[in-house]
Amino acid sequence: MDLPGSLTEILGEEKVSVSEEIRDAHSGDKWFASHQPEVVVFAECVEDVSKVLAFAHRNRVPVTTRGAGIGYVGGCVPVEGGIVLSTARMNKIVAISPQDGVAVVQPGVITGELQKAVRALGWDYPPDPASLKECSIGGNIATNAGGPRCLKYGVTRNYVLGLEVVLANGRVMKCGGRLHKNKTGFDLIGLFVGSEGMLGIVTEATLRLIPKPVSRVMLAAVFPDFPAAAKTVQAILQAGHLPSALEITDSFTLEAARKRLGAETFPPGDGHLIVEIDGRPAAVRSEGEEIYNLLRECGAGDIRVAMEDEECEAIWQLRREFSYSLRDTGLTKLNEDVVVPRGKLVELVEFARKLQKETGIAIACFGHAGDGNIHTNLMVENYDDPETRARADAALDILFTWVLEKGGAITGEHGVGLAKKPWIKQALGETSFAVHRSLKRALDPHGILNPGKFLDD
């Protein structure tokens, strides 16, 4: 079959590419695997997506959906070739309605651009992954993306009120809408959010907005070590505070950040905590003072306080530099996003230190302390060496097994993709895995949507 020719006939040549350069650019994400598709399709509307899937369904052609392509787990790698369907051109903010408290967007809208647009009107879309300047709403929905502020405000799923989805056979389904409360039928929205492109393709989303908090304060505190910072997280929450963010960092990450950004950026100390509070001005000031005193009581050394938006954003920018700082070390960063019950934070870091000694692989820990989602990154030297890679995989196996034994999860926001496929049955359990497969077969009987990922052998 002449796949490019057939698709060109359906969509027109301006939406179809077989260029080597284009196919290579759409062969993977930020993970280590890649595979060229046979053809790349640039959908511009729901009708384009519907036509492509109807054709692919009839002809048993694999279709891998791609948003911004900046995931960390190989979720958009077209393992079986076929068609990569890019939603990058579907990048319109269709509507923003303060009256209804919603925004209607296409999947290619960049998350940070949506935030800017709604904040200009005095509203907010809280989910804020570190890659918000690059990532798309469609990708966020596919992985149920989180971010630092999900402690108080929740993850992407908490903001999806409605979806337009094209099913594997090309039929278009709508579920939900502009209603902030709706219990009609099954929670189909919850089924598609986090489904990693394996059950259908989202072509439009209706997202919940909230009034933009009028004031905020940030406290960035340095501690003697990571356990002291982790214990402070518990102290803050036990005292009745619910910050919008609680971000923790270990010594390895801090040292890498000092090298990239300057030694003066982070005062001496081997643990670091960022606390953000938002709300009404008087309440924020009062709570900020209480937390400042609590940080001191818990052993914090230097505490930086920011009250203006510009100062607060400067602290967030430092936090967003952590991943880049770790890459600057020259080591390969295996970007893991495990989750443990909040009470196990200190145990997790102690286990990571033990694992580092046993394997000789450096481990850098930072992330969302408030919800137990810590990026436990293996920093590997000479990762291209097969023996080294095998040692790193063995270390990951030890880490994931420990996390699951403690009641945790192997991924909190990046998704499973290819990277965590070897551990999915262990993570889900036999019965849950079988239910996942049953749902997949019901919605995609020919298995054309994002094949080769965690539900396939």
Positions of the model-derived regions?
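FAD-binding subdomain of flavoenzyme oxidoreductases
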Residues: K92-I96, G101-T249, L449
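N-terminal accessory segments
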Residues: M1-K30, R58-V61, L294-C312, E405-I410, ...
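Conserved, mostly hydrophobic/aromatic
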Residues: A56, G197, D444
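Short beta-alpha connecting loops at secondary-structure transitions
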Residues: N91, P98-G101, D384-D385, A419-K425
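C-terminal substrate-recognition/cap domain of FAD-linked oxidoreductases
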Residues: V18-E21, H26, L207, P211, ...
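N-terminal flexible segment immediately upstream of the FAD-binding catalytic core
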Residues: M1-A54, I70-G101, A130, T253-G262, ...
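Activity-critical C-terminal alpha-helical subdomain
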Residues: R171, K421-D457
